[in-house]
Amino acid sequence: MALTIGIVGLPNAGKSTLFNALTKNNVLAANYPFATIEPNVGVVAVPDERLDKLAEVFGSAKVLSATVEFVDIAGIVAGASKGEGLGNKFLSHIREASAICQVTRVFRDEDVTHVDGEVNPASDIGTIQTEMILADLQTVEKAIPRLEKETRGNKAIVANLEAAKEALAALEAGTPVIATKIDLELVRELSLLTAKPYIYVFNCDADELGDESLKNEMRALVAPAEAIFLDAKFESELVELGDDDEARAMLAEMGVTEPGLDVLARVGFDTLGLQTYLTAGPKEARAWTIRKGATAPEAAGVIHTDFQKGFIKAEIVSYDDLIAAGSMNDAKSAGKVRMEGKEYVMADGDVVEFRFNL
């Protein structure tokens, strides 16, 4: 699915280091502003332990995870909305993203310069939010006269005009559009930056990762958005190990149970409004990506459009019921497998076999 998460942040916040670790790519990560100019795109697997279990049950030869796409975008600076730094390029790239992941520097390292001369997470978050709001103000101010003209001949878009005016008022008050009650569908065509869902990644050092008071302070700063805490440099070192046992030992030493990258991939997937259903057989156990709220025929169409066109029924068992039963035959004997029709809304973790007529 063509949905992406744009990784943004001030220069030297750790964006490219995080992206390198996420995608296991060696993207340029340098200690100077704008080391990234053109956005780098990486497809990241979403960790899902259910696939390994399914592979055991069905004797699958391989597993295929769902994926989420991250884009590493040039560092933003104050004045970006006026074209400062690489502002115009930054804003055009982030406008294309479906959600935003802001990397905020918490770690202190004299060898890594800060664009403003001091580490201040609240100030950094405020800088980027201000630039996004200013950019959206420009967009909405241009859109309203156009919408006013268009409504004279098309009353169907009056609601869009009113939503744009509400957005203008919110932005002038310094409020991101996503924090309002505006129907986002009515302003979707404007591609407003502050209407996108947000994830905040706080790039910490080892001591800060164990400081619950600091983490709670950061969570409160960005609530209700998701806050993830990790050490991008450490995560990069974990990836370089290539040894799961050694990686687990390093994580245990840090006092964490799983890599921050795994958390980010899952949270990113969820933030995009996505979920998975599962299929399994001797060839592969696979997670398929669908939007939350997708119907069974729509889910079938992800495999092949012909499956959606010729959809008849879906044979479904929940993952938990299947694993508890031990096999598909035992799940059927226990009455846990059911047939669902065209109106069925898929649940995350449904194990499915589609029946269709070509």
Predicted regions and their residues:
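Protein kinase-like catalytic core scaffold
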Residues: 69-72, 99-102, 200, 228, ...
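Amphipathic alpha-helical transducer elements in NTP-driven molecular machines
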Residues: 34, 48-51, 64-70, 84-97, ...
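Short, intrinsically disordered, mixed-charge
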Residues: 24, 56, 92, 130, ...
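Conserved Switch II/interswitch segment of TRAFAC-class P-loop GTPases
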Residues: 42-47, 74-84, 95-157, 170-182, ...
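Conserved G1/Walker A P-loop phosphate-binding module
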Residues: 1-84, 88-109
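C-terminal-of-GTPase-core extension/linker across diverse P-loop GTPases
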Residues: 2-8, 13, 19, 146-345, ...
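Short, flexible surface segments
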Residues: 96, 347-348
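Conserved protein kinase catalytic core
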Residues: 26-27, 78, 111, 209, ...
